[in-house]
């Protein structure tokens, strides 16, 4: 059944939530305080931003890890209610975090799904832990869900949960959405556990991807690895779903590009305090003629090095002026215990130091670099202050930062430079699209964005805003859940 208006009556052997979201993390983080007690704080991330309002309206439950290590994984804590959200914590031990999360999820699946920018590592011990933790999530979800409930499983860390949950609770309607790219078939085939992953996903009634290409790849793999009959027609965006025929049921496969709460962002960005802070930011930067901005997790997929290299060469060639152009890079710390991420941070900070050493002046660097989280309203002020937004990933499932920047520009100012290899590029066609592997092309595109006329900038931004404001996160969730509801309830 589709999510209803609240928590159902509890039935023996079932939970009491008619709608359950399952994700690697809860929408709040648990912290241990110096006195040994614990406290909760809101956790960052696009997934939380996208799903929390929907779940709150539905008064459902959220199953996820609270963010702290707990060796007593067999002891189940009672559900927690925070701001009218029922939270179902799943405990992870230090070994779970090392092998399931940092290992299989982020050193095996993440690089494989992002076109092998970094070589994936295949360890059988990591796979075994991934299976065990996915089962723990499935069991926690089974305990939370009311009879006939709708369950929405999120992302690459939990790709085995749909099949495990189907086995435990055939009465449930199960959806799965992948928030990162789904790789080309020839890359996915490298995975030693490729068949198990596909079977895991086929436990869902609906499997969703950002783009039609990911959906088509999954249909092909279902034929090749499972021997299933599948639809052969093209999958459409938010329409024309593919189908995988199993022995007793049909799994639908679709493309549902995620978005943001664009109306809320638009309203916040118009606020007088945000506008004042944006002016202050420009003043603190020395009132340059042009401000370029990058906002990313510090991740090797994001192409931060590409934009820094392009900016450095534009300065060297005199195509950007060191006395009136600055670049601000906000880099949120990410996966700091993973070797490739530690190396990336060293490389980026060395690059920033080199550029400032070559082109900056005392008290006036040309690159301003922050390696820490930035409060939400401060980030919005940076969006309002920036003349050019640089979004240059080598591969990205969607990239919500691009949409957030557009939502904040009610003044129709600014320019968006956007990698062709983001999901967002399929929708934001009036951005300055760029191939991040083509450095000369990146330089030319950034220069064009810096020098665009007011009329050209307003024309592009008006079109971008029309797209982003019309296709918001509510529409994304609605389109997925409507398609999931059409799968119908399952009788146990």
Curated annotation (Swiss-Prot):
It catalyses: ADP-alpha-D-glucose + D-glucose 6-phosphate = alpha,alpha-trehalose 6-phosphate + ADP + H(+); CDP-alpha-D-glucose + D-glucose 6-phosphate = alpha,alpha-trehalose 6-phosphate + CDP + H(+); GDP-alpha-D-glucose + D-glucose 6-phosphate = alpha,alpha-trehalose 6-phosphate + GDP + H(+); TDP-alpha-D-glucose + D-glucose 6-phosphate = 5-methyl-UDP + alpha,alpha-trehalose 6-phosphate + H(+). GO terms for biological process: trehalose biosynthetic process. Keywords: Glycosyltransferase, Transferase. GO terms for cellular component: cytosol. Probably involved in the osmoprotection via the biosynthesis of trehalose and in the production of glycogen and alpha-glucan via the TreS-Pep2 branch involved in the biosynthesis of maltose-1-phosphate (M1P). Catalyzes the transfer of glucose from UDP-glucose (UDP-Glc) to D-glucose 6-phosphate (Glc-6-P) to form trehalose-6-phosphate. Probably also able to use ADP-Glc, CDP-Glc, GDP-Glc and TDP-Glc as glucosyl donors. It comes from Mycolicibacterium paratuberculosis (strain ATCC BAA-968 / K-10) (Mycobacterium paratuberculosis). Pathway: Glycan biosynthesis; trehalose biosynthesis. The gene is otsA. Pfam families: Glyco_transf_20. UDP-alpha-D-glucose binds at residues 45-46, 297, 302, 400-404. The keyword Heme does not apply. The record marks 110, 180 as: Involved in alpha anomer selectivity. CDD domains: GT20_TPS. D-glucose 6-phosphate binds at residues 25, 101, 155, 335. This is Trehalose-6-phosphate synthase.
